[in-house]
C-alpha cells in the first residue's frame, strides 16, 4: 500500500527548510533596506544583529548561560552525616557533614564553587544535561520550536501508523 504522500503526489512539510527560507528572505529584506539608505552603504549593515534574524543555529552552538534568577533560586542543601561520603561530580572531593551545597532540579548536588561558574557559561547540569531556563529569548524560542516540531513529527507518525492498522 502506498503512503499518503505517494497517493497525493506531495511531500511532507519540512519545517526546518521552511524556517531557513523565511530567515534568508528576511535577511535579504534587511540587507536591501540597510544598503538603500545607509551612508556609504556600510554602517547599518555592519550593525545588523544576526540573532535578531534568528540566524543563530542553536543545534551547532553552545547553549547560553542559565538565567541568573533561576541560579539564585536553586535550593541550598545541608549535607547530613549519612551523605558525607558523596562526592561533588565536578571536583571529585567528598562533601563534608553540615556543608551547604547546591541542588539542581535533577537532584544532583554540587559545591557552589564548582557549579556556579559552570552555570554562568551554560544552562545544563554537567552530569545529565537537564536544562535550566535562560535569559536568551532566541534560545528559549528555539527550544519551543524544537518541541513543537517533535510533537508534529510524533502526530504525523501516529497518523501514518493509524492508516495501516
Curated annotation (Swiss-Prot):
Pathway: Protein modification; protein ubiquitination
UniProt PTM: Auto-ubiquitinated as part of the enzymatic reaction.
Gene3D superfamilies: Zinc/RING finger domain, C3HC4 (zinc finger)
Any GO molecular function: zinc ion binding
Superkingdom field: Eukaryota
Phosphothreonine modification, residue list: 165
Span of zinc fingers (RING-type): 88-129
Name of the molecule in the record: E3 ubiquitin-protein ligase RNF181
Organism lineage string: Eukaryota, Metazoa, Chordata, Craniata, Vertebrata
GN (gene name): Rnf181
Amino acid at each position: 500500500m502506498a503512503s499518503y504522500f505517494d497517493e497525493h503526489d506531495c511531500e511532507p512539510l519540512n519545517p526546518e527548510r521552511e524556517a531557513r527560507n523565511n530567515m534568508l528572505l528576511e535577511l535579504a529584506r534587511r540587507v536591501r533596506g540597510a544598503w538603500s539608505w545607509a551612508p556609504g552603504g556600510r554602517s547599518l549593515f555592519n550593525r545588523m544583529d544576526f540573532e535578531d534574524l534568528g540566524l543563530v543555529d542553536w543545534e551547532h552552538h553552545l547553549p547560553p548561560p542559565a538565567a541568573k534568577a533561576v541560579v539564585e533560586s536553586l535550593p541550598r542543601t545541608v549535607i547530613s552525616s549519612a551523605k558525607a561520603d558523596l562526592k561533588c561530580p565536578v571536583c571529585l572531593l567528598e562533601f563534608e557533614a553540615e556543608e551547604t551545597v547546591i541542588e539542581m532540579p535533577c537532584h544532583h548536588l554540587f559545591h557552589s564553587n564548582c557549579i556556579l561558574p559552570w552555570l554562568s557559561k551554560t544552562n545544563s547540569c554537567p552530569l545529565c544535561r537537564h536544562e535550566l531556563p535562560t535569559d536568551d529569548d532566541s534560545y528559549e524560542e528555539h527550544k519551543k520550536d524544537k518541541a513543537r516540531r517533535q510533537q508534529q513529527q510524533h502526530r504525523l507518525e501516529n497518523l501514518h501508523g493509524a492508516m495501516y492498522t
